Amino acid sequence: MSVNYRLGALGCLDLSSLSTSDITIDGNLYLRDLVLALQWVRDNIAQFGGDPDNVTIFGESAGAHITATLLAVPAAKGLFARAISESPAAGMVRPRELAVEFAARFADLLGARPRDAASALIRATPAQLVQTQHRLIEQGMQKRLGAFPIGPTFGDDCLPVDPVEAMRSGQSHQVPLIVGTNAEEGRLFTRFLKMLPTNKAMIDELLADAEPATRERITAAYPDYPKPSACIQLGGDFAFNAAAWQIAEAHGAHAPTYLYRYDYARGPCAGPDSVPRTPPNCSRSSTSTGPRSVRCLPLPPTGDMRCGSATT
């Protein structure tokens, strides 16, 4: 089953710092929505033939990040038995100090003075909130690549600790976890959502504050850099693969954790540095090695790549 939860500025932007003595605004509203949905499943799923003690939560990309985050939400304890996080996105969790900054920017873009921000939020239409959200995202990405304002904030009753730190210290829900990514995660983002560093200019911006030796070590890890294929790989590693590896290593120290990688073959017309115009029609499954505390999925080999439907 799937659930609806509040998105963007309506649920994923922490505006709690704009609360007043008579208007209380909670943070992490979308996580609270998901906890309520899981509680509903616990209380009602048996009526539909389900087993409330055998619930698996899973998601892809932003959904994968939410899945991993729920592992660190105290109120979600006991509401699921295992989790699958497919291509979790990095850089979406923020401390309260940064959330306060984003909230102030949001109020300013909405045209509200700080002391009137809470009432302005109540008066604003959903369309105005969404439009302001898009402006905030664009502004944040211009100021610093990867500064994405939409996502969970840690430091409140809903999410007390950064999820990866909670996993690392054993404070998260220690249920079996599958986590992994796909080959060339950054390739799709070369055509839309220019928020991933998938070209040299964006990578230079990303690494602008890094020490020269650090920049050299990072780019040296991609022998073909700055060719497009290497930039795309670096962008995918930054946004998705690094997050999956961190989650796997942290969670794997305390609970069964399985790290996977899904590979595909590009069509015969795609050159090494080209971007496919349509999804490739050849694929295969594979596993990757990970941290020693992480087990690899025992997937059987699929043999030669074959055109047509993906084989598993």
Segments and roles (model prediction):
Residues 23-28, 89-94, 163-164, 225-238, ...:
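Active-site rim elements
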Residues 32-35, 39, 97-101, 173, ...:
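A structural signal for well-ordered alpha-helical segments within the folded catalytic domains
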Residues 43, 77, 86-205, 231-249:
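Substrate-access "cap/lid" subdomains that shape
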Residues 11-19, 193-195, 276-283:
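Short, flexible, mixed-charge acidic loops at enzyme active sites
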Residues 181, 209-243, 248-253, 258-264:
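Alpha/beta-hydrolase fold catalytic core
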Residues 1-115, 166-189:
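Serine-hydrolase-like catalytic core of hydrolytic proteins
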